[in-house]
């Protein structure tokens, strides 16, 4: 397992908090602009909805607020097949094997894939590379979370799918 891996721990305990902080900073700059009646740093209503809005709706509301809280799926490291005491449950099956901070879906993966939102705002010349880097970071985070025994493939796949669909839908609607 990748539980004691430096990069895995950095992703798990540091980088993702900085990503969430960046969404908060974007919101704060936008709010300052609203209060001072000007656009600051090019952050208008559309930018704040795409970035801070999708961070709130995706990782916080959908993934952590609904699925992780109410789905009850035990983490791989906690199921009997891997030496734990909990029973395996399917990804879309509501279970009673976990009471808090459950496996389905992956919050870390959702936050990592959120980088797609600011990547879509990159200048056209660099957008392909920004999107590729965002998706690569999301996939790397997903692989590390699986390797740490924290999530099944389906947990990270559903998180990635929810975030990509949400962000692309909001982007297409606004831009």
Task: Say what each PLM segment does.
Residues 1, 34-35, 144-147:
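Juxtamembrane "helix-exit" motif on the non-cytosolic side of transmembrane helices
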Residues 1-27, 68-76, 80-87:
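N-terminal transmembrane-helix/juxtamembrane module of multi-pass inner/ER membrane proteins
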Residues 16-34, 118, 165:
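Hydrophobic core of alpha-helical transmembrane segments in multi-pass integral membrane proteins
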Residues 19, 23, 52-62, 66, ...:
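Hydrophobic, lipid-facing residues on alpha-helical transmembrane segments of integral membrane proteins
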Residues 23-26, 59, 138-145:
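Helical transmembrane-bundle signal
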Residues 33-38, 172-175:
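Membrane-interface capping segments at transmembrane-helix boundaries
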Residues 41-123, 129:
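Membrane-interface loops
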Residues 88-175:
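Membrane-embedded catalytic cores of phosphoryl/pyrophosphoryl-handling enzymes
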């Amino acid at each position: 397992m990748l539980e004691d891996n430096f990069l895995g721990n950095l992703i798990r305990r540091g980088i993702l908090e900085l990503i969430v902080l960046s969404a908060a900073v974007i919101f704060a700059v936008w709010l300052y602009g609203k209060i001072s009646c000007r656009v600051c740093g090019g952050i208008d209503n559309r930018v704040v909805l795409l970035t801070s809005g999708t961070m709130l709706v995706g990782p916080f509301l959908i993934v952590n607020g609904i699925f992780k809280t109410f789905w009850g799926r035990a983490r791989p490291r906690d199921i009997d097949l891997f030496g734990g005491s909990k029973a395996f449950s399917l990804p879309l099956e509501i279970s009673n094997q976990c009471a808090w901070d459950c496996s389905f879906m992956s919050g870390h993966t959702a936050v990592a894939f959120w980088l797609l939102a600011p990547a879509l705002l990159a200048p056209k010349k660099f957008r392909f590379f920004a999107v590729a880097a965002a998706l690569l970071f999301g996939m790397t985070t997903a692989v590390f979370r699986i390797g740490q025994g924290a999530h099944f493939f389906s947990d990270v796949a559903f998180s990635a799918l929810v975030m990509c669909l949400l962000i692309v839908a909001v982007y297409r609607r606004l831009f």
